[in-house]
């Protein structure tokens, strides 16, 4: 062969690698330019005119800043035409998620991360929206009005939520994805990422967000879906751009699609003996296990196919002590659980958050899995798992006697009677019931029997009639409680606070944000400061009665304080905040948004004196 041919091959490979590198390192701006290229090369004929539509309805979401019975700061604001755009600033008519930055990860209530979570999975929250007409998407525009840059993934679903007949198959496809990236723009923007063409029409779009790099809450105003009724024909140039995007190994659906193959890979017994296994059999069994601990679940599936020795190691139940299935929510189903079942008999941490919706996991499939794999479970994450019902919680209570950590956050379809089963889990130390329909009777039973609770989240639990009764029971029974979330509890008073403060003296974190019935004039906040010296986080968000006396008591008694939110108070002066900052050396977050006495000049002066403290002051244009 002529020497020129290998040289041509090398040059061709180098050129291809450059193309891939260029696609991987493209900025959002480059992608938007790429989007314009695609649009210009896929012009539709009049017979296939583009349909432009705003979201008709918000059908599911993981969290929001607002309450369950109003529209302010709720995800439901994403339905319909924009309310705020193109204005910028903090507006109640927008959709806002519950958290931002890394502040919640630094709190005493934060859970440890799961091992084996693929680096490509960075989503923290999601919202799903439906549209009137099914179309082949050509563009998805997100109107961001405050602290943009949280959206990191956009998906489309093949199921039509408005169809009277359930589909035989439900598919999710990633239209666009990117790792979290700091966006310097502070003004409102219309985010227009370059999306991938898919081969089915959709009217169900899902946005996934990561707010860890944001300086404050992101606010979304509307979502616009562009598409055609018939599948568009793209030019060769467009196809090349899309292919480069699809081949980006850093953040694509490769791992997300592995659950399709997972069922086959683990069940395959037709492994060739082969003459060699790379001398792995010379290594101690424990060392191989330690090495394999660093592999993601899909990589473990792939490795299991290489030789019998590694198949044995990859199927060892010790590899599944911690099992995080949340990254694979779009593909995980009953069959997946069935093939994982034999390998999960020793599982202690299990994350099924976001999984099983739209029929992917059945009650019987979940029950079968737990009956085999539940005996050793210590931690079970089930956030937004809408397949759960009364039977599922009964199975959890019977099959998981060692359970210490249960997260049912945003399982808002669980019937109230289901929560009574939780009282049987007497070893519970952490219970998250945020945005659930737990009722007072069931909760009182839980508190009575689960006396070892250390972390309890009751944020936005709207079915509880009297939070004073709940607070009294917490104070009487939960002496080891360290963190308590009462965000937007509607009727707690100074009486409940008194019982809580006297009974739970170990509290390190207390969220009383948007609790309108608490009044500083009753002395409730002074009592908290004097009786809870270990407080590290205190949120008194939107309580307009918080005053200088309360702040000064915190400065005198709660010197370990790290995070304080007093958004919306009219009664706090810069002088009292200075005392607080001087006394609380560990304070790192202070939110004084909409505090009428704390103007921008005061914030600048405090920032200059205490540069290590992040002082937040929101604004409305």
Swiss-Prot record:
Q: What do mutants without this gene show?
A: Fbxl4 knockout mice exhibit loss of mitochondria and perinatal lethality due to excessive basal mitophagy.
Q: Name one GO biological process term.
A: negative regulation of mitophagy
Q: What Pfam families does this protein map onto? A: F-box-like
Ranges for domain F-box come to 277-332
What GO annotations for molecular function exist for this entry? ubiquitin-like ligase-substrate adaptor activity
Record keywords: Cytoplasm, Leucine-rich repeat, Membrane, Methylation, Mitochondrion, Mitochondrion outer membrane, Nucleus, Repeat, Ubl conjugation pathway
Positions annotated as LRR repeat: 376-397, 402-421, 427-448, 452-474, 480-501, 504-524, 532-558, 559-583, 584-609
Q: Which Gene3D superfamilies match?
A: 1.20.1280.50, Ribonuclease Inhibitor
Top-level division of the source organism's lineage: Eukaryota
Query: Known SUPFAM superfamilies for this protein?
Result: F-box domain, RNI-like
Disulfide feature: none
Question: Which locations, inside or outside the cell, does it occupy?
Answer: Cytoplasm; Nucleus; Mitochondrion outer membrane
In-chain residues carrying the UniProt-annotated modification Asymmetric dimethylarginine? 28
What InterPro entries does the annotation carry?
F-box-like_dom_sf (IPR036047), F-box_dom (IPR001810), Leu-rich_rpt_Cys-con_subtyp (IPR006553), LRR_dom_sf (IPR032675)
- GO cellular component terms, semicolon-separated: mitochondrial intermembrane space; mitochondrial outer membrane; nuclear speck
Subunit:
Part of a SCF (SKP1-CUL1-F-box) protein ligase complex. Interacts with FAF2 and VCP. Interacts with PPTC7; this interaction promotes destruction of BNIP3 and NIX and mitophagy suppression.
The protein's job, in short, is:
Substrate-recognition component of the mitochondria-localized SCF-FBXL4 ubiquitin E3 ligase complex that plays a role in the restriction of mitophagy by controlling the degradation of BNIP3 and NIX mitophagy receptors. Also rescues mitochondrial injury through reverting hyperactivation of DRP1-mediated mitochondrial fission.
**What is the protein name given in its UniProt record?**
F-box/LRR-repeat protein 4
- Gene that encodes it: Fbxl4
């Amino acid at each position: 062969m002529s020497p020129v041919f290998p040289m041509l091959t090398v040059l061709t490979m180098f050129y291809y690698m450059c193309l891939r590198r260029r696609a991987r390192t493209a900025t959002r701006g480059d992608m938007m330019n790429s989007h314009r290229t695609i649009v210009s090369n896929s012009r539709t004929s009049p017979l296939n005119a583009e349909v432009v539509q705003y979201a008709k309805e918000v059908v599911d979401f993981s969290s929001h800043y607002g309450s369950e019975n109003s529209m302010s700061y709720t995800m439901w604001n994403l339905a319909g035409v924009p309310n705020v755009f193109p204005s910028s600033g903090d507006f109640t008519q927008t959709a806002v998620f519950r958290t931002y930055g890394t502040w919640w990860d630094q709190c005493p209530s934060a859970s440890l991360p799961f091992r084996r979570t693929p680096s490509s999975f960075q989503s923290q929250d999601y919202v799903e929206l439906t549209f009137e007409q099914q179309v082949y998407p050509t563009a998805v525009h997100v109107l961001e009005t405050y602290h943009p840059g949280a959206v990191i993934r956009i998906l489309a679903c093949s199921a039509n939520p408005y169809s009277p007949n359930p589909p035989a198959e439900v598919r999710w496809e990633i239209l666009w994805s990117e790792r979290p990236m700091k966006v310097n723009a502070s003004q409102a923007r219309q985010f227009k990422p370059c999306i991938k063409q898919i081969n089915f029409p959709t009217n169900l779009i899902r946005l996934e967000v990561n707010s860890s790099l944001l300086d404050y809450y992101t606010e979304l105003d509307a979502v616009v879906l562009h598409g055609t009724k018939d599948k568009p024909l793209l030019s060769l140039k467009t196809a090349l751009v899309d292919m480069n995007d699809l081949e980006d190994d850093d953040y694509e659906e490769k791992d997300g699609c592995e659950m399709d193959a997972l069922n086959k890979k683990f069940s395959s017994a037709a492994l060739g003996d082969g003459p060699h296994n790379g001398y792995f059999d010379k290594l101690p069994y424990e060392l191989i296990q330690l090495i394999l601990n660093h592999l993601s679940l899909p990589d473990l599936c792939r490795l299991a196919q290489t030789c019998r020795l590694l198949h044995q190691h990859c199927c060892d139940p010790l590899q599944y002590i911690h099992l995080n299935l949340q990254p694979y929510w779009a593909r995980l189903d009953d069959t997946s659980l069935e093939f994982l079942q034999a390998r999960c008999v020793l599982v202690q941490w299990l994350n099924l958050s976001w999984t099983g919706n739209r029929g992917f996991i059945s009650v019987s499939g979940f029950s079968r899995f737990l009956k085999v794999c539940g005996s050793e479970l210590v931690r079970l994450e089930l956030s937004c798992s809408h397949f759960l019902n009364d039977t599922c919680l009964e199975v959890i209570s019977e099959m998981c006697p060692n359970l210490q950590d249960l997260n049912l956050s945003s399982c808002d379809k669980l019937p109230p009677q289901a929560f009574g089963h939780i009282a049987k889990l007497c070893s519970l130390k952490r219970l998250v019931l945020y945005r659930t329909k737990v009722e007072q009777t069931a909760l009182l039973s839980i508190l009575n029997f689960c006396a070892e609770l250390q972390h309890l989240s009751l944020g936005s639990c709207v079915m509880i009639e009297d939070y004073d009764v709940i607070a009294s029971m917490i104070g009487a029974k939960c002496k080891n409680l360290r963190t308590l979330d009462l965000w937007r509890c509607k009727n707690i008073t100074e009486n409940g606070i008194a019982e809580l403060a006297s009974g739970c003296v170990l509290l390190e974190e207390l969220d009383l944000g948007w609790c309108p019935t608490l009044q500083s004039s009753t002395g409730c906040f002074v009592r908290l400061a004097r009786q809870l010296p270990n407080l590290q986080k205190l949120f008194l968000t939107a309580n307009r009665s918080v005053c200088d006396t309360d702040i000064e008591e915190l400065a005198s008694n709660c010197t370990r304080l790290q995070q304080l939110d007093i958004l919306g108070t009219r009664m706090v002066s810069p002088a009292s905040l200075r005392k607080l900052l001087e006394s609380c050396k560990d304070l790192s977050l202070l939110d004084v948004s909409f505090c009428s006495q704390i103007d921008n000049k005061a914030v600048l002066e405090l920032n200059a004196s205490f540069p290590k403290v992040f002082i937040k002051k929101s604004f409305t244009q």
